[in-house]
């Protein structure tokens, strides 16, 4: 890879799509690539896909590029425009290295490049950050145009993004978002998995997952705090602490890769199965898993020693998760906790691999024999569930981690329903843990990125956050003392847990009061020069208000509205005019295309008084919107939390539900 001077790098960003075009680049086999996508387009649609791709280029290049893009479509199922992939190193540079007329635009450039950093992204050359299909852009022409627009943007313009495509810069004003992102917005009738395959191949939409297409991914750290909370509280359900408990799960990808680290922090022994050797090796080299084994007998010889010693240790099983579960069921192994975080939101395109088929053979099968691949996946899910059922009958606590495991298992005909076939036999982790303990009280995955790139700025921010949480905990009500204690323990140990992959970022579960006070202290520290550069605030879309998803984020909503998407849409609209630097709204994310509506924001803190005003207004809405909806659904914790919020802020007036006695309804129908 060519070494660029700072001036050369900045000129490349300003350039946009080069003319003349760069030479084609060879396919790099050392990088983890996306699997070949399904060949779903008709011949006429393939011509349309080429026509759509060529509109980024002058006519003089059309004949040459038409053949090149046709070959990409044939070989990979998508047009990535590999020729335009930059040859400079892709990572989050210090904010001052980005050529921008507007500080906010420079911060967004940093966040985009972090999402595409090979150390961070799952399939960096295909612009996929995580989840198998969570895209930042559809192709490299879009990336180059976005960087050009951001380098030109003033603080009175807004960049409009249509599913990776930059529609353009439009006049706005200083308090407007600098970027507004939509990903995968479809007419509801056209939101099935094959619709994603077709319209993504045509180059007209994309699946942004959550933080991939919204430029807010911070590596596997992004969910490790939530996963730690989940594992801790799942273990608490069994009693007796976490030491010596065995947790088995699957997935070492961009999000799922947080599981072994979370297990270590929670104090359990964990085994995480992963079929992709490149993903396993990546997490091992990054220190996110302690040992890797491909032989099950050898694996459990080591695991049993860790259990006996009651040491926190993480193991990766390099192989198929079904083989792992069936081994445990057949050998009578005691498993305390079980889950799954394979990408079952994307089951037919690399999110889940069938047992009995090698990884490489499965990739060929999914592209060339998609119906057979689907049959094999569903057969594997039936075996997967059967083994899990045997272990839960012996006392294991199993929970769905919001990856569509229960949903796809039910579609596969697995024995996943309860006795009267009215609900799944296993809870979503949101139903049992995250919803009632965190979301209903306003706690969720708040995050920040120090744009200086300096670890010392991150250290300072950790210290500020710990101080603020300590102050809040001193007078917090009993209902949230456990959450406050867990979060203080988290931030106290954050540095020593070596969580940073990519940008200097931190994840921290916090409620409205915590987020607002931490952000205000950050802004003050930037103003005083105690933190040397702006901080980007954000959160996962998987949060109190950000996502409507009946199989995950809103699975503990029982008033019938768990399939309604008003909350997520209202949230992004409200954030946009209350001061967010950028906002996004996506179809899909977590459980899958057509199953979820989710959104997020980014906010650049620059030390100004205007920023202090915006952060207080926006964060208050961003949390209390979701608490209000959860309260209206009669969730006890949310009713408590929103009443408390109204006491703190007299301007907040929320409609409260009147509870109905069961006797009133008896005998009516």
Predicted regions and their residues:
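Short catalytic-loop micro-motif centered on adjacent basic/acidic residues
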Residues: 246-249, 312-317, 399
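Glycine-rich beta-alpha junction loops
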Residues: 277, 319-322, 341-346, 402-408, ...
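Long, compositionally biased, glycine/small-hydrophobic-enriched stretches that function as flexible linkers
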Residues: 1-201, 205-216, 370-521, 525-538, ...
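Solvent-exposed alpha-helices and their adjacent loops that cap or buttress functional pockets
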Residues: 152-154, 170-174, 189-190, 238-242, ...
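Small-residue-enriched alpha-helical segments and adjacent helix-cap loops
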Residues: 535, 539-570
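Residue-level detector of anion-binding/catalytic polar loops
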Residues: 269, 334, 397
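Active-site/ligand-binding-proximal alpha/beta "capping" segment
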Residues: 314-342, 349
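Catalytic or ion-translocation cores adjacent to nucleophile or general acid/base/metal-coordination motifs
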Residues: 208-232, 236, 242-246, 250-310, ...
């Amino acid at each position: 890879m060519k070494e660029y001077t700072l001036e050369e790098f900045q000129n490349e960003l300003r350039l946009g799509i080069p003319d003349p075009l760069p030479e084609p680049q060879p396919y790099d086999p050392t990088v983890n690539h996306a699997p070949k996508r399904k060949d779903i387009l008709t011949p006429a649609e393939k011509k349309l896909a080429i026509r759509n791709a060529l509109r980024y280029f002058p006519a003089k290049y059309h004949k040459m590029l038409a053949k090149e893009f046709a070959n990409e479509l044939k070989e990979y199922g998508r047009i990535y425009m590999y020729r335009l992939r930059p040859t400079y190193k892709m990572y989050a540079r210090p904010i001052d290295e980005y050529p921008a007329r507007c500080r906010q635009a420079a911060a967004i450039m940093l966040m985009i490049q972090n999402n595409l950093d090979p150390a961070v992204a799952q399939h960096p050359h295909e612009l996929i950050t995580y989840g198998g299909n969570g895209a930042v852009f559809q192709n490299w022409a879009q990336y180059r145009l976005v960087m050009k627009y951001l380098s030109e943007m003033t603080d009175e313009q807004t960049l409009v993004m249509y599913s990776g495509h930059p529609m353009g810069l439009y006049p706005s004003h200083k308090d407007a978002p600098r970027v507004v992102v939509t990903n995968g917005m479809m007419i509801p009738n056209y939101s099935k998995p094959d619709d994603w395959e077709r319209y993504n191949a045509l180059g007209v939409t994309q699946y942004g997952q959550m933080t991939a297409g919204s430029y807010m991914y911070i590596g596997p750290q992004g969910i490790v705090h939530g996963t730690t909370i989940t594992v801790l509280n799942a273990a608490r359900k069994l009693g007796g602490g976490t030491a010596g408990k065995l947790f088995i799960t699957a997935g070492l990808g961009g999000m799922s890769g947080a599981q072994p680290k979370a297990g270590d922090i929670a104090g359990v022994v964990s085994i995480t199965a992963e079929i992709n050797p490149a993903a396993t090796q990546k997490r091992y080299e990054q220190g996110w898993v302690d040992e890797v084994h491909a032989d099950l007998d050898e694996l459990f010889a080591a695991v049993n020693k860790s259990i006996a010693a009651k040491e926190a240790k993480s193991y990766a099983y390099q192989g198929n998760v079904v083989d792992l579960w069936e081994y445990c069921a057949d050998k009578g192994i005691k498993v305390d906790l079980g889950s799954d975080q394979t990408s079952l939101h994307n089951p037919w395109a690399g999110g889940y691999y069938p047992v009995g088929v090698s990884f490489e053979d499965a990739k060929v099968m999914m592209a060339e024999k998609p119906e057979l691949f689907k049959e094999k996946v569903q057969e594997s899910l039936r075996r997967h569930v059967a083994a899990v059922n045997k272990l839960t009958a012996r006392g294991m606590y199993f929970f769905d981690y919001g990856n569509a495991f229960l949903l796809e298992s039910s579609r596969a005909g697995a024995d996943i329903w309860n006795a009267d076939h009215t609900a799944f036999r296993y809870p979503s982790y949101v139903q049992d843990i995250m919803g009632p303990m965190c979301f209903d009280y306003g706690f969720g995955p708040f995050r920040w990125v120090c744009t200086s790139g300096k670890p010392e700025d991150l250290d300072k921010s950790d210290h500020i956050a710990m101080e603020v949480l300590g102050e809040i905990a001193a007078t917090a009500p009993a209902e949230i003392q456990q959450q406050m204690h867990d979060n203080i323990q988290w931030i106290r140990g954050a540095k020593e847990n070596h969580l940073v992959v990519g940008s200097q970022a931190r994840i921290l579960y916090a409620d409205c009061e915590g987020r607002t006070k931490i952000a205000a202290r950050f802004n003050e520290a930037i103003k005083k020069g105690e933190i040397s550069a702006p901080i980007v605030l954000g959160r996962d879309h998987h949060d109190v208000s950000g996502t409507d998803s009946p199989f995950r984020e809103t699975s503990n909503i029982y008033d019938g509205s768990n399939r309604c998407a008003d909350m997520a849409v209202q949230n992004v609209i409200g954030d946009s005019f209350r001061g967010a630097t950028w906002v996004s709204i996506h179809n899909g994310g977590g459980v899958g295309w057509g199953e979820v509506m989710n959104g997020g924001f980014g906010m650049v803190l620059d030390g100004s008084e205007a920023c202090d005003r915006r952060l207080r207004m926006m964060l208050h809405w961003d949390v209390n919107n979701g608490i209000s909806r959860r309260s209206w659904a009669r969730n006890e914790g949310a009713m408590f939390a929103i009443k408390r919020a109204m006491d703190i802020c007299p301007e907040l007036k929320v409609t409260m539900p009147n509870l109905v006695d069961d006797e009133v309804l008896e005998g009516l129908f």
